[in-house]
Amino acid sequence: MDRCSSPSPVPELLRGRVMALEANYLRVRLEQPGPDGQRLLLCTRRARLAHGGQQVMVGDWVGVDGCDWSAARAAVASLEPRSSHLQRPALANVEQVLVVVALAQPSLDPELLSRFLLSAETTGVEVVPLLSKADLLEPAAAQAWCERLRGWGYEALCISQSNGASIAAVQQRLAGGVAVLCGPSGVGKSSLINALVPTLELRTAAVSGKLQRGRHTTRHVELHDLPGGGLLADTPGFNRPQLPADRQQLPLLFPEIRNQLEAGSRCRFRDCRHLTEPGCGLDRSWERYSSYCQLLQEAS
């Protein structure tokens, strides 16, 4: 008798990860296969999860019971603690956020890139910029962008779907973990996923000539297996990132500020905004400082 059909009054739960949301159902992949090798189950949620206010997200580790192996159906009965979670989109246990922007077609807007990076920093996980369409620039120009981002506190990767080595570098970076792509539409996110996971063949769309924005082609959040290990999530695109309304959160979203504080720089006041306060211990000679000041004003 299999574990899910046991008559025990306290049935053993099977551990699995939520791979996708489909309407009102969860697609869960079991950590260990079922009696006939089944790994994927279409699951409902037990009412007690909803009554307890527990939202189940893609990426969650869950316990399932009530398995109907012939129909590949079950129910999610428990939710494990998360190492991290994103609210927009709803995604759990992410280890890296990959911010994808194009170096050309459309040309890279440093202010837009900065805002996407700040939005990604609100997740509290590692942020990695991916500079797509690198083949449309001279190598020196693409490398100059990587050097510029190093000054912002990031190790960026230049990528091109026609350059197998650059795709391999991304796959190596993602091996073993869970990562999510974000960034404006039209920068090649779906093309990148197709290159990383060739079996998917996600639909792509050309960039519109008038607005230089892409027509988004991803409709829902789903985890995809990477050939070298790890999981990758695509998210519905958006043209502007979301920044925190609370200006107190803003300073620590900048690696330029975090790195100075971690290196021992100290300010006289605990709530120093690093503007004109007396006793501010930070060096302000970094490229994005004026942008930081502007964002503080916007949040006021």
Give a label for each model feature.
Residues 185, 190-191, 195:
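Walker A/P-loop
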Residues 6-12, 24, 47, 52-62, ...:
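Helix-rich effector regions associated with P-loop NTPase G domains
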Residues 35-46:
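A short macromolecule-binding patch
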Residues 19-25, 29:
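N-terminal "pre-motor" subdomain/linker immediately upstream of P-loop NTPase catalytic cores
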Residues 102-154:
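Phosphate-binding glycine-rich loops and their immediate beta-loop-alpha structural context
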Residues 136-187:
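Canonical P-loop GTPase G-domain recognition
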